[in-house]
A protein has these predicted regions:
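C-terminal substrate-recognition "lid" of short-chain dehydrogenase/reductases
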Residues: 84-113, 118-119
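Conserved SDR Rossmann-fold cofactor-binding beta-strand/turn motif
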Residues: 40-50, 99, 112-114
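A general structural signal marking secondary-structure boundaries and capping sites
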Residues: 7, 65, 80, 84, ...
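Short, small/polar-rich loop/turn modules that mediate ligand/substrate recognition or access, typified
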Residues: 35, 40, 106-108
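A glycine/serine/threonine-rich, flexible loop-to-helix segment
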Residues: 49-79
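Charged catalytic carboxylate motif
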Residues: 22, 53, 90
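Catalytic loop of short-chain dehydrogenase/reductase
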Residues: 1-36, 45-50, 78
């Protein structure tokens, strides 16, 4: 899982963007190494998942200026192409599909599960 911050430039993502890019590059190299053995490697972009936006988590990031999680969720929804924030079940359902035989031809890629919050 990465946040998709490797896809573009955004303030306050100077550490996350390069780390995501490195992880995504590693996944592609790993896919080329283990693919001949029939192993697939697929990553997921997740960002702004509603169930992870707790007041406690945001306090760790924002300190004393903790915004109301509902306001943050609405801001994410407004910024997303699908006009809704991604949900944990979106990520879980996508991961289950990718792990299944129905996705047998998918490897060495990142699947975007951000409701269009991140695009490349």
């Amino acid at each position: 899982l990465t946040s998709g911050s490797s896809a573009g430039l955004a303030p306050m993502m100077g550490g996350t963007g390069p780390a995501d890019a490195a992880t995504e590059t590693y996944m592609r190299y790993l896919a080329s190494e283990v693919g001949p053995s029939g192993v697939r490697v697929v990553g997921l972009w997740t960002a702004g998942v509603v169930e992870t936006l707790t007041r406690a988590k945001m306090a760790d990031v924002a300190g004393d200026g903790v915004p109301d999680p509902e306001i943050v969720i609405q801001m994410i929804a407004n910024a997303a192409m699908l006009r809704r924030a991604p949900r944990l079940d979106d990520v879980a359902d996508t991961a289950a599909f990718l792990a299944s035989d129905r996705a047998a031809g998918i490897t060495a890629t990142i699947v975007n599960v951000t409701s269009g919050l991140v695009a490349r």
